[in-house]
Amino acid sequence: MEEKPKGALAVILVLTLTILVFWLGVYAVFFARG
């Protein structure tokens, strides 16, 4: 589990950014529809 902490951080960062972009897209569509 402690082999590559940087790799784990990178995975968490990518997941966070993906979720953030996903929710921004959902919110944009929801807002566009009124």
From Swiss-Prot:
Transmembrane segments: 4-34
Localization annotation: Cell membrane
EC number(s) on file: 7.1.1.9
Residue positions, PTM N-formylmethionine: M1
One Pfam family it belongs to: CoxIIa
One GO MF term: cytochrome-c oxidase activity
UniProt protein name: Cytochrome c oxidase polypeptide 2A
Organism in which the protein naturally occurs: Thermus thermophilus (strain ATCC 27634 / DSM 579 / HB8)
